[in-house]
């Protein structure tokens, strides 16, 4: 469809000629975003074209269900003004382009209070409870999901990567190790709601207030999953001291809200194991984007993500067989 056809469905009262339309660069998804600026008054909104929404029931579509859930619980998200399931389009509030990544890069002194606020928002999100038979509470980081992410990495980072030369024995051994790591992460009694992609590009900070986007894949899992996404971020490396402070803040707030009763040492152990899984999953995505889709903008994040692995391996012996094998097979990417 042409853009004007989407606009006719969502804004039938306004002529496309009255709007200035500019493309917004998205992340690793098939959704497309455009900023619409009303020429008469400079007011802006965002057009999102989501192929997955086309023909779906809005009452059960995860993007709408999760957005309403977060908004009802006081989590700041872009408002949805209109939607049209026939074309798969949304008209959203424009919360600007100031991502957490950009903001911290431009204002490094904000690394303290701003990240404290983001951790507080995360714990607020992880405190939300709901019906276990309904999305997003019916979904979880179960064995099937975690192993799917490991297998995606094995396929795109190793099997289909001409710069890696794994043997069949290497791949079988690695998959066995991934199965064992997955088992360590299946502590379902500790599961809470997770955003699932809680990194610095999915948090906008207009006027310094966190606004959460790209939340449609929310599901249940260990609270460390989202904390890892934020604190062991492929796109933005935080100082180790600040990471330690934020880990402590996250753990303490989980305890204060009755969401966890583990020691801080146990929290840190699961954090490392979860971080290993999460970073390996991210590597699979980056190789897929670069080698399959030809999107080389993700290439720089391969080495920065691999750089996290030695720390996990050193601290957690359970990760050593898989971690050392991955680093050896991808040694050409290790800086």
Feature names for model-found ranges:
Residues 3, 7-13, 130-139, 144-145, ...:
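An alpha-helical support segment within catalytic cores of ATP-dependent transferases
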Residues 34-148, 152, 159, 187:
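ATP-binding pocket architecture of kinase catalytic cores
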Residues 145, 195, 219-220, 268-276:
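Secondary-structure capping and boundary motifs in well-ordered enzyme cores
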